[in-house]
Amino acid sequence: MKKLVLCVSILAVILSGVALTQLSTDSPSNIQVAERPVGG
């Protein structure tokens, strides 16, 4: 079970990284706003 969770988590990290790179290339402004803390 632990191996399964590890595989899923690694896949999620890779997918999120790819999605972030694609979004940053499409709209860098949205990424900058998302990375900023809500408090300012």
Curated annotation (Swiss-Prot):
Domain of life according to the entry:
Bacteria
List UniProt keywords, sorted A-Z: Competence, Cytoplasm, Secreted
Provide GO CC annotations from the record. cytoplasm; extracellular region
Give the phenotype of cells or organisms lacking this gene.
Deletion of the gene results in decreased expression of genes activated by ComA, and significantly changes the expression of 40 operons.
Which residues get removed as pro-piece? Answer: 1-34, 40
Q: Where, per UniProt, does this protein localize?
A: Secreted; Cytoplasm
Consult the record and explain the modifications the protein receives after translation.
Contains a predicted signal peptide cleavage site in the N-terminal region, however the propeptide is probably only subject to processing events at the ends of the mature peptide.
Biological process (GO) annotations?
A: establishment of competence for transformation
The record's family statement is:
Belongs to the Phr family.
Functionally, this protein is described as follows: Signaling molecule involved in the regulation of genetic competence development. Secreted during production, but the mature peptide acts intracellularly, indicating that it needs to be imported into the cell to function. Stimulates expression of the genes controlled by ComA, a transcriptional factor that regulates the development of genetic competence. Acts by inhibiting RapK, which regulates the activity of ComA.
Remarks, miscellaneous: CSF, PhrF and PhrK stimulate ComA-dependent gene expression to different levels and are all required for full expression of genes activated by ComA.
Query: Could you identify this protein by its name?
Result: RapK inhibitor
Tell me what organism the protein belongs to. Answer: Bacillus subtilis (strain 168)
